[in-house]
Amino acid sequence: MANIKLFTRHKVCDGFFDDVDLVVFPGGDGEATTFKGILKPNLPDVQCFMQRGGKYLGICMGAYWADAYYFNLLKGTRCVQYIKRPSAEIRSSYGTTAQVTWRGQEHRMYFYDGPTYLGGQFDTVATYANGDPMAIIQGSVGLIGCHPESQANWYSKKYMLPHWHENRHHLMLSQFVADYLLHSRQMHLF
C-alpha cells in the first residue's frame, strides 16, 4: 500500500521523503511566481528524492513543473502549451473538455490549459485529438496534461454537464499510477 503524505513548503524537512514512493503535483493555479514562492525552496529535496529512485506524477501545472524551468526532471523533453500547437482543437485557456484517446479508448477529459510534450524519448499513454501526447511516462516521471482527478463540481457549467465522467477518470488515474509508476495493482487514490 502506498504511503500518502500531504505537504506544504513549511512541512518539508530532512527525511520527509524517506518513506515516500511517489510525489504528486496535481493541477491547479500556478505559474512561475507560484513555483518560486512555494516550491523552489524544496527543489533540492524533490530532486534528491528523484535521484534516490522516487517517482513523480504531475497533472496539468504539476506536469509543467517537471520541465527544465522548474524541477528539471525530463531528459530531452519539453512541456509546451497544448493550445499553442498549430493543430490543437482547443485554442484558449478556459475550463473545457478535450477529446483524448487513453490506452486506445476515446474520452472527453477536463482540460484547463494543460501541456503536451515534445522531443526526447517517452512512452505515450494518451493523446489529444490531434495526436499530440497528453499523458506520458519517462522513466520514473508520469505526466498528464488533462485532469483525470477532476471532481463533479468542475462540470457545473451547463455546457460541461454532459461530460462528467462519473469517476471513471479517477479509476484511469489510479491505474496509470499503479501500472506505470508504482508497478502495483494495489493503488486506490479515490
Give, region by region, the residue ranges found by the protein language model:
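A glycine-rich, often tryptophan-bearing local segment used as a flexible ligand/cofactor-contacting loop or short
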Residues: 31, 35-100
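Extracellular ligand-binding/catalytic regions of CAZymes and related secreted enzymes
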Residues: 47, 148-190
